[in-house]
A protein has these predicted regions:
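Alpha-helical transmembrane bundles and membrane-interface segments of multipass inner-membrane proteins
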Residues: 1-158
């Protein structure tokens, strides 16, 4: 609300500069699609998809099907980002983006995008880390079982 009521579309206000380079700007943009404007014009699909993701994640968290705090935190960030962008899509028909980092030539984005991306990355990292731990534990258990069987057969041979 602050951005679209106080700025003109495409207007940019430098926040952090180094020399002649504006590193961080508040730039008012509207995005009728998803990330990088993909699925532009597919508002109904984006609204329904986002709503389904939010409902599924809330169900998984509230029904206690997901118990690990790291998963819950990650999913909460995804839900928060989804709700933020969903509100924009329903009210405005598009998402208001305003964070413009120019040290890398990157798309303008918003706080909801940050939440969704950090949540998705966190969930991915935690799931992969847990899978690696589980595989290591299975290998250790196999080695322990195999060592125990060797010791048992050695003792039986005596």
């Amino acid at each position: 609300i602050l951005i679209d009521s106080n700025m003109q579309l495409h207007q940019s206000i430098p926040i952090i500069s180094f020399g002649d380079t504006n590193v961080l700007n508040i730039t008012y943009e509207r995005n009728p699609g998803a990330a990088f404007s993909i699925l532009e014009g597919k508002q109904l699909f984006l609204i329904l998809f986002t709503a389904v993701v939010i409902v599924v994640m809330l169900y998984l968290m509230l029904s206690k099907r997901v118990k690990k705090p790291t998963y819950i935190w990650s999913m909460s960030l995804i839900v928060a980002g989804g709700i933020g962008n969903l509100i924009d899509r329903v009210i405005r028909g598009e998402v208001v983006d305003f964070i413009d980092v120019r040290i890398i030539n990157f798309a303008v984005f918003n706080v909801a995008d940050i939440c969704a991306v950090l949540g998705a990355l966190g969930l991915l990292l935690f799931v992969v880390a847990d899978e690696i731990k589980e595989q290591k534990n299975k290998r250790s258990a196999k080695k322990s079982t195999a060592a125990g069987e060797i010791e048992k057969s050695t003792n039986e041979d005596k």
